[in-house]
Amino acid sequence: MNILIANDDGVFAPGIQALADALKPLGRVVVVAPESERSGFSSALTLDRPLRPIQIAEDVWAVNGTPADCVYLSMNGLFDFEFDLVVSGINSGANLGDDVLYSGTVGAAFEGRLMKQPAIAVSLAGPDVRSYDHKDDYAQAAKWVHDFIAKGLPALPPRHIFNINIPDVPQLKGTQITYQGRRAQSKPITSHVDPRGRQVYWIGLAGEAVTDPQRIASQIQSDFFAVANGFVSVTPIQMDATNYAVLEDLQASLG
């Protein structure tokens, strides 16, 4: 099996290094990732300048582009063989609920799925993970991903991926299949004056999770709930954002 690994934290991030080490027993692992952090780039492709892949080690490449660029290049001519699976991560920080709209980790996985290959996005969720600087900090999460793939990935329809969030806890309680939760409105932006007297702004922090009473009543838990309670969250998500119930209502009322 040929496995392509990408991320949005950059080719030197400890999460991608831990993931590559963990998956090597499953086949050939090729890492193609941005040369520096590209968080928040979603599925963006670089169209205004050339991309320059640079091989920095055996089966490890750095690209001056976005996470989706890395996958696009890898599956459209950078290599003379095909990949069987795309794994994006392990991201330093959660990609829960509405986070998937912005996530370069998820964007890279979706790009792989557009190329007709199974794809998963993996993130490590916890308050301290942004400070982790060694691949051993991601070892438990990487092993979980190895085991998940080794057992055989469940089949998904076309244009679907698994979005996986692994809590940063001493011992995982298990795995829950979850729905994509949602957050309250983001915190307000913060404003400061820089040393040269110019006004600058920081995007506000992400909002808190919002509960869904209807889904709670049906005993389906959100990705937020699973991670907060020590479970790995596995959420099937899709590219098609059409609301078919509303579509049918509009057809009935306006058609």
Swiss-Prot record:
Disulfide bonds: none annotated. The lineage of its organism: Bacteria, Pseudomonadati, Pseudomonadota, Gammaproteobacteria, Moraxellales. One of its GO terms (cellular component) is cytoplasm. A divalent metal cation binds at residues 8-9, 39, 91. It holds the Pfam family SurE. This is 5'-nucleotidase SurE. Keywords: Cytoplasm, Hydrolase, Metal-binding, Nucleotide-binding. GO terms for molecular function: 3'-nucleotidase activity; 5'-nucleotidase activity; exopolyphosphatase activity; metal ion binding; nucleotide binding. NCBIfam families: PRK00346.1-4, surE. SUPFAM superfamilies: SurE-like.
